[in-house]
């Protein structure tokens, strides 16, 4: 019985292996920011294809295609992860602009009448080291080195007095920046030396004084143009302001009096005087008559 049980187990195991036809794990790598493609087992008369993605961080992603219904499905997958072409004739998976979060295990399962066939991948994202040497806006040499995980070491020839600055990023890279700050180069071009497990590179640069002279010349010209423009605006405002100030004022209006107005003003006074005289004469005559003896009349 024990031997029969073992035989059954072996038979079942062989059947499962035959049906699943799983291959070994294929280790692949992709450069950060580049595209990568993974293919499925080549089989005929496929009825269904499924990609199962298990990243180190995040949720599982699934892409599926059914031949009989000519339909595709996508679950929890980024827009960057998709079929390379039409899945009915090309079942390859393409990842655009690979990031560190895409690291993990990728499995393609192909189903046909002969069984299920698998191909497994383990994706590793590589950050290619990068070195850059340039002159800043002040004509000083600047050296940059971008590497993965550990920071690179930067040194200068001649020796520089500056301290490098290291910045860590979310994608797992570290950027080191160093400014050349030596007092004298003895006529030699500054040389930047980058040391790292994945990068050993040396570059030289000449940030000559002509570069700084060019910047200074441009600054002087711009300043001169700004001053000229400012003076022109002031002159324009002053010119138009004086025009408004010197506009001819309306002449002072001198009141004029006509002889008719004088006559109108004098006539009331004359009438008044005449009335006074008449009243005075009447009173005088009455008084004189009262003082005369009876029978006499005042002389005229």
Swiss-Prot record:
Gene3D superfamilies: Immunoglobulins. Glycans are attached at residues 45, 76, 105, 171, 200, 206. Residues 235-300 are cytoplasmic. Residues 25-124 form the Ig-like V-type domain. It comes from the Eukaryota. Pfam families: V-set. InterPro entries: CD200R (IPR040012), Ig-like_dom (IPR007110), Ig-like_dom_sf (IPR036179), Ig-like_fold (IPR013783), Ig_sub (IPR003599), Ig_sub2 (IPR003598), Ig_V-set (IPR013106). Residues 122-206 form the Ig-like C2-type domain. SUPFAM superfamilies: Immunoglobulin. Glycosylated. This is Cell surface glycoprotein CD200 receptor 1-A.
């Amino acid at each position: 019985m024990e031997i029969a049980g073992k035989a059954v187990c072996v038979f079942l195991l062989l059947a499962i292996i035959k049906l699943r036809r799983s291959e070994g794990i294929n280790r692949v790598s992709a450069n950060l920011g580049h595209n990568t493609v993974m293919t499925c087992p080549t089989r005929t008369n496929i009825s269904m294809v499924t990609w199962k993605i298990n990243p180190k961080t995040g949720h599982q992603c699934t892409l599926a295609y059914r031949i009989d219904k000519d339909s595709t499905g996508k679950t929890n997958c980024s827009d960057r992860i998709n079929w390379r072409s039409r899945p009915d004739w090309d079942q390859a998976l393409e990842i655009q602009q690979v990031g560190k979060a895409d690291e993990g295990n990728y499995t393609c399962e192909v189903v046909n009448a002969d069984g299920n066939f698998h191909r497994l991948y383990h994706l590793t994202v590589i950050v290619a080291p990068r070195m850059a040497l340039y002159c800043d806006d002040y004509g000083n040499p600047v050296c940059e080195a971008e590497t993965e995980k550990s920071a690179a070491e930067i040194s200068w020839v001649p020796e520089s007095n500056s301290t490098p600055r290291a910045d860590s990023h979310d994608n797992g890279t570290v950027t080191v920046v160093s400014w050349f700050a030596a007092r004298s180069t003895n006529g030699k071009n500054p040389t930047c030396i980058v040391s790292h497990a994945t990068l050993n590179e040396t570059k030289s640069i000449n940030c000559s004084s002509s570069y700084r002279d060019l910047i200074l010349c441009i600054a002087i010209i711009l300043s001169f143009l700004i001053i000229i423009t400012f003076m022109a605006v002031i002159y324009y405002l002053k010119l138009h302001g004086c025009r408004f100030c010197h506009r001819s004022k309306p002449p002072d209006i001198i009141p004029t009096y006509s002889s008719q107005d004088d006559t109108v003003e004098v006539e009331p006074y004359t009438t008044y005087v005449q009335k006074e005289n008449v009243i005075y004469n009447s009173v005088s005559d009455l008084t004189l008559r009262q003082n005369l003896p009876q029978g006499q009349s005042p002389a005229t």
